[in-house]
């Protein structure tokens, strides 16, 4: 699920598109590079988001994202 795009289904950010940057059990962390940055991602329950079928990052882009967090927000914005 990490690297996929997701749409928020509940909360004040309902309808917003995010990139899944981390997951842990029933909780995922989302970033959009604008209001939710890579350094301070949004924590959301899995049932409150829906994955987008097309889009996201492949494994090489994700590795680069995690190794170089200084440019992470720009890369996330481009992906969305």
Question: How would you name each of these model-derived features?
Answer:
Residues 11-14:
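Short, charged beta-turn/beta-strand-edge "cap" motif at the junction between a beta-strand
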